[in-house]
Amino acid sequence: MAAYRADDEYDYLFKVVLIGDSGVGKSNLLSRFTRNEFSLESKSTIGVEFATRSIHVDDKIVKAQIWDTAGQERYRAITSAYYRGAVGALLVYDVTRHVTFENVERWLKELRDHTDANIVIMFVGNKADLRHLRAVSTEDAKAFAERENTFFMETSALESMNVENAFTEVLSQIYRVVSRKALDIGDDPAALPKGQTINVGSKDDVSAVKKVGCCSN
């Protein structure tokens, strides 16, 4: 039980959702970040799945509760409960399948319809290790991210490329917005109740953060 107690020591709890077409590698991104595991035999997720991991941002412990779409995206059955309370999202496409890139606009609309307008979004081009099969250029994806005012990275869950960076960037940006908002109203950010749904502030707060931008390495 000690391990469970240790895992509960955190200053913030942020809910982050993974969205995107089936087969783009969402579950492997989740397992790579939370358990440093990758499965070549990965089957479509069935049933609700989420995992947690805590990271340090400044001198605070930020715990991420990361939700996987559980295969429901194949049936267009993702419910509003999946999105409820999310303050961050990774919108994933497969760089080798152009149709998954074409569908991100629909995913983004659904995400924004069901979440706070200021949610921190990372646009993720996964399977970047399959260079010889690339069907979506980095430039096209960057242009989309800039147009939609989101962050962007290309990742490889297989090679563990940028997976850590993508998740930690989202969590760090959420933390910065929440911290700045707390300072503006004179609150101690650490005093916010654990598990509270975090309102990530006014539109100006997040657009100012997002202008910093982020791109693939």
Swiss-Prot record:
<dbReference type="GO" id="GO:0005525">
    <property type="term" value="F:GTP binding"/>
</dbReference>
<keyword id="KW-0636">Prenylation</keyword>
<comment type="function">
    <text>Intracellular vesicle trafficking and protein transport.</text>
</comment>
<feature type="binding site">
    <location>
        <begin position="126"/>
        <end position="129"/>
    </location>
    <ligand>
        <name>GTP</name>
    </ligand>
</feature>
<keyword id="KW-1003">Cell membrane</keyword>
<feature type="short sequence motif" description="Effector region">
    <location>
        <begin position="42"/>
        <end position="50"/>
    </location>
</feature>
<protein>
    <recommendedName>
        <fullName>Ras-related protein RABA1f</fullName>
    </recommendedName>
</protein>
<feature type="binding site">
    <location>
        <begin position="68"/>
        <end position="72"/>
    </location>
    <ligand>
        <name>GTP</name>
    </ligand>
</feature>
<dbReference type="GO" id="GO:0003924">
    <property type="term" value="F:GTPase activity"/>
</dbReference>
<dbReference type="InterPro" id="IPR001806">
    <property type="entry name" value="Small_GTPase"/>
</dbReference>
<comment type="similarity">
    <text>Belongs to the small GTPase superfamily. Rab family.</text>
</comment>
<keyword id="KW-0342">GTP-binding</keyword>
<dbReference type="InterPro" id="IPR027417">
    <property type="entry name" value="P-loop_NTPase"/>
</dbReference>
<keyword id="KW-0813">Transport</keyword>
<keyword id="KW-0547">Nucleotide-binding</keyword>
<feature type="lipid moiety-binding region" description="S-geranylgeranyl cysteine">
    <location>
        <position position="214"/>
    </location>
</feature>
<dbReference type="GO" id="GO:0005886">
    <property type="term" value="C:plasma membrane"/>
</dbReference>
<feature type="binding site">
    <location>
        <begin position="20"/>
        <end position="27"/>
    </location>
    <ligand>
        <name>GTP</name>
    </ligand>
</feature>
<dbReference type="Pfam" id="PF00071">
    <property type="entry name" value="Ras"/>
</dbReference>
<keyword id="KW-0449">Lipoprotein</keyword>
<dbReference type="InterPro" id="IPR050209">
    <property type="entry name" value="Rab_GTPases_membrane_traffic"/>
</dbReference>
<dbReference type="InterPro" id="IPR005225">
    <property type="entry name" value="Small_GTP-bd"/>
</dbReference>
<dbReference type="GO" id="GO:0015031">
    <property type="term" value="P:protein transport"/>
</dbReference>
<keyword id="KW-0653">Protein transport</keyword>
<feature type="binding site">
    <location>
        <begin position="156"/>
        <end position="157"/>
    </location>
    <ligand>
        <name>GTP</name>
    </ligand>
</feature>
<feature type="lipid moiety-binding region" description="S-geranylgeranyl cysteine">
    <location>
        <position position="215"/>
    </location>
</feature>
<keyword id="KW-0472">Membrane</keyword>
